[in-house]
Amino acid sequence: MAQSALVTGAGGFIGHHLVKYLVDKGYHVRGADIKRPEYAPTSGQEFEVLDLRRFEDCLIAARGMDEVYHLAADMGGIGYITENHADVARNNVLIEANMLEAARIHGAKRFFYSSSACIYPLYLQEQPEVTPLKESDAYPADAEPGYGWEKLYGELLCRYYLSDHGLETRVARFHNIYGPEGTYDGGREKAPAAICRKVALARDGDEIEVWGDGEQTRSFTFISDCVEGIYRIAQSDYPEPLNLGSDELTTINNLVDVVSAAAGKSLIKRHDLSKPQGVRGRNSDNTKAREVLGWVPGVSIADGMAHTYRWIEAYMQRVGAVPAGVA
């Protein structure tokens, strides 16, 4: 009989891709989310539209599942999470606590939790040429307001459910996941998708808006690398949080250049210093993931962004979002 897995957040970007990955592995997969996938039908055998802030809905979602992959969260890009600290923190704490308890009640064998690099202390991320963050850097804690603190609390809840109830929890700290079929507009999009959208809408020689001075640095992880890492972490015997990210550091300005090159356009950057830009620099130290999992990301930022841009441009053209004459 096939192993069964629940993927919460299956209507979202990472969850949607993870469902397909697990189905291809031979799992019977149930997706659960407050919405269905936006850009393509789910690959899973089941999909439940549920509000996981409600404990009763979490019990429905987790019933009969061998493994739980918990990705559901109220989140978005830097603009959204900096303007909605209270809602983000409250909603996500409810979802996390409810899903852990529902998994325990229904006897799930494993529980994967998607944490975030936003848990890392702000005092370690004040320079663009940042030292890559290793897992032990999380404490003394000084997480990002709202989203970062609630993700750190979620990690602690997982630790308590492992120690108190024997639920085999596994934790990944995501570093800026991107790729096709991710939200690219509406206010919840992340920087890679937002840049792809802006470039797709621009004519050769146009200006495009860049939030901040563009010299803030990040590492970005392609979705195929992410879902492979999720599975390896979930199936491992390692109970502590692990970074799941690329260690290829880039500036936001360079990200714009990479996408512009993929589009064959020469564009002028117009920097808006009034917009939120997050921490000054962040990169992932993948030493522990290599040691424990043998996992290394395989997709470069140039290849991943080109692939992402082509998907966003094609989708926008298909729905009529790209004006005539823009190519």
Annotate each PLM feature.
Residues 5-25:
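N-terminal Rossmann NAD(P)H-binding glycine-rich loop of SDR-like oxidoreductase domains
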Residues 21-24, 50, 201-327:
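C-terminal substrate-binding subdomain of Rossmann-fold SDR/epimerase-dehydratase oxidoreductases
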Residues 27-36:
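Conserved glycine-rich Rossmann-like NAD(P)H-binding loop of the short-chain dehydrogenase/reductase
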Residues 43-55:
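Rossmann-fold cofactor-recognition segment
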Residues 52-91, 102-105:
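NAD(P)H-binding glycine-rich loop region in Rossmannoid oxidoreductase-like domains
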Residues 92, 143, 147, 151:
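Active-site YXXXK catalytic motif of short-chain dehydrogenase/reductase
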Residues 97-144:
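Conserved Rossmann-fold NAD(P)-dependent oxidoreductase catalytic core, especially the SDR/UDP-sugar
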Residues 123-132, 146, 156-234, 247-249, ...:
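NAD(P)-dependent short-chain dehydrogenase/reductase
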